[in-house]
Curated annotation (Swiss-Prot):
It comes from the Eukaryota. GO terms for molecular function: (1->3)-beta-D-glucan binding; lipopolysaccharide binding; pattern recognition receptor activity. Residues 1-20 form the signal peptide. This is Gram-negative bacteria-binding protein 2. The gene is GNBP2. It is found in: Secreted. Keywords: Glycoprotein, Immunity, Innate immunity, Secreted, Signal. Residues 21-115 form the CBM39 domain. PROSITE patterns: CBM39, GH16_2.
Length: 461
């Protein structure tokens, strides 16, 4: 994350006479195209570097916050043009083993070279106030503000400060970032989940548009003729013979009635303990079910009976009740954990009922995962705290987003009123029955059946 202008007085200072650490010398290079580059060499213990630049004592100052070293250096590139006789003031804060150290240099451009005129450990950059005057960037040592170490553990192993943003995707690029996100590609009908869907990476099922991620379930045109083969694209790890292909001629087997998408960050980002915020609009439509969840890195997105931390979910149905008459439709939000014991799910959930379907509008869904509890929030309102089941989640987890259909855990026959659902879980002809009754559920689907995600952010706790 980078800022270009200094908006307020930061209360950060160092004492580089303590602990035996000395900030390395600042390297400077004029770039051929435009601007300049400054850096310091990486050393074991350096956690982050904060650069500040000011030309000729004028305001505003520029600054750059670097969270990781690249090729052995902590580098900041600036497009700011420098002219002959310009005086460039460089100040930096270096976090080393949870302590903050400062270094400042004032340099002058002479024939496109930068000559050091003053090297200081106390001078600070200034910035423009509302009255048109500049104030010191660095505060007195007694006002120092230190980074408070977080309990969060990140996949790259670096140290974090409480409240620090450690992962973010605003989906601002023209397409899904394939370095960050990978697709789960397999069918889910004839195994543990018994979900009536195949996950694929087709553009119609997962795409970015106008800064939002869309995961869209689409109904198949034909399910009974031919065979279903995913080939080498299939990502199944436990049962590829069942999840990658459906053989023609098996009396109960049909091709998937619905195609959708599921993506994950297992290969790029995972964390243990932290705060995750997802701004999303959930899907609407009978038997649709959204996945906004975390899953342990010791498993794969395709692992059966995997433990899950479900950030939030609400069923797609506009009207759905249990045998006891309880409302479990789309205006009923849930979040919590799911673990498995001998093939049976044990759920630790909290819930909140709204006056409207959670697919009607965007909401901020938040899970704060700490050592001793999990806090669940929607639109900054706490609706539950969990203390049970935490020992089951004692490793880093990655993020999963997806939209599925059905599933014996998501729509449990033992809970639902009789004859509400057009198929029965764990019956050989469940998928065929679901397809044959499509006139009942397909009209409830439409443009609102997509799950739309505005952003996902993860903060250290």
């Amino acid at each position: 994350m980078r800022w270009e202008f200094l908006p307020c007085l930061l209360l950060l200072i160092s004492n580089n006479k303590i602990f035996g650490f000395k900030v390395p010398s600042i390297n400077f290079e004029m770039l051929k195209d435009e601007g300049f580059e400054v850096s310091i060499p990486d050393e074991p213990g350096i956690q982050r570097v904060f650069y500040m630049f000011q030309i000729d004592d004028t305001c505003p100052a520029l600054m750059d916050y670097i969270t990781e070293a690249v090729n052995g250096s902590w580098v900041s590139k600036q497009k700011m043009s420098l002219q002959n006789n310009d005086k460039l003031q460089i100040s930096m804060l270096v976090q080393f083993n949870e302590e903050i150290f400062e270094k400042s240099e004032t340099r002058v451009i002479i024939n496109t070279r930068l000559l050091t005129t003053k090297d200081s450990s106390s001078r600070g950059i200034t910035f423009l106030t509302g009255e048109g005057e500049c104030q010191a960037y660095l505060a007195p040592a007694q006002q120092a503000k230190r980074c408070k170490a977080a309990q969060t553990i990140v996949s790259n192993g670096r140290h974090t400060c409480q409240g620090e943003l450690i992962f973010e995707d605003n989906f601002s690029e023209a397409q899904l970032n394939k370095t960050t996100w990978k697709h789960d590609i397999r069918q889910r009908m004839y195994h543990v989940e018994e979900e009536l869907v195949a996950f694929d990476d087709a553009a119609r099922n997962c795409f970015v548009k106008e800064g939002e991620l869309h995961i869209v379930p689409t109904i198949a045109t034909e399910v009974t003729d031919g065979s279903f083969k995913l080939g080498d694209r299939c990502t199944a790890v436990e049962s590829p013979e069942q999840e990658c292909n459906i053989a023609h001629g098996i009396f109960y087997s049909i091709k998937p009635p619905v195609f959708s998408a599921q993506i994950h960050t297992r290969n790029s980002f995972s964390f243990k303990f932290g705060k995750i915020v997802v701004r999303a609009k959930l899907p609407k439509g009978d038997w649709l079910f959204p996945y906004l969840m975390l899953q342990p890195v010791s498993t794969y997105a395709e692992t059966h009976y995997a433990k899950q931390l479900r950030i939030a979910y609400a069923r797609g149905n506009a009207n759905l009740r249990t045998k006891q008459g309880d409302d479990i439709s789309g205006n009923h939000l849930y979040g919590g954990g799911v673990v498995w014991h001998h093939g049976n799910a044990v759920q630790f959930l909290k819930d909140k009922i709204s006056n409207s379907h959670y697919g009607d509008d965007f909401h901020n869904y938040t899970m704060i995962w700490q050592r001793d509890k999990i806090t669940l929030m929607v639109d900054d309102e706490v609706y539950g705290e969990l203390y049970d089941g935490l020992p089951f989640f004692n490793e880093k987890c990655f993020i999963i987003f997806g939209v599925t259909v059905g599933g014996f855990l998501n729509f449990d026959d033992s809970l639902l009123a009789k004859d509400v659902k057009p198929y029965k879980n764990r019956e050989p002809r469940a998928a065929l029955s679901f397809w044959q009754h499509r006139d009942a559920w397909a009209p409830t689907w439409g443009r609102h059946s997509a799950m739309v995600i505005d952003y996902v952010r993860v903060y250290a706790e």
